[in-house]
Amino acid sequence: MWKKINQESKKLFDNCLKRNLIVTTAESCTGGMLASSIVSISGSSNIFHSSFVTYSNEMKSKMLEIPIELIIKNGAVSEIVAYNMASNVLNLMKADLSIAVTGIAGPGGGSESKPVGLVWVAVGTIKKIITKKYFFKGNRLEIRKETTIEALKLANRIIEES
C-alpha cells in the first residue's frame, strides 16, 4: 500500500505544480499520514504549506472553527463535519485545494450505525466541495493507509476534472 500512497502523492504533486495550486489538509483518523505522504515528495513546499491534525472534537472546533454543537449533533465522523473541515481549512489557510478526512480506524470506537472502517473524505476548491463515504476493512494501520490513498485519488480526480 505504501507504493500506492507514493504514486498518488506524486500525482497530486504533479497536478498541483502544473496548475500552480496550494494544497492544505485537515486530518483526524489518518493522524498526519496524508500530509506526510505529500511532504515526502521533493519540492513539496511549492504546493503544500500547512496541515491540521484535529483528532479531538475540541480541536476540530477550536482550530477549524467547526461549531461544537454541529459535531455533537452529527458526530465527528459524518459528512457534514468532513465538509466543514475541508471548507474551513481551505478558507483559513487561503489554499486552492483542501483535503479532509474523518473516520473510525479501530479497533474500538465503532458502533452499529458507524462501524470501524467508516471514513468520510472531503476535497474542496474555491468552487465546490465533494464528500465521499468509504467503508474499509483491515487493522488500524490498513484503514489509515486506505483512507490516505482514497483521499489522494479523490483530490487528483477533482483537480483533473476542473
Task: Name these PLM-found stretches.
Residues 1-162:
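Short alpha-helical segments enriched in small residues
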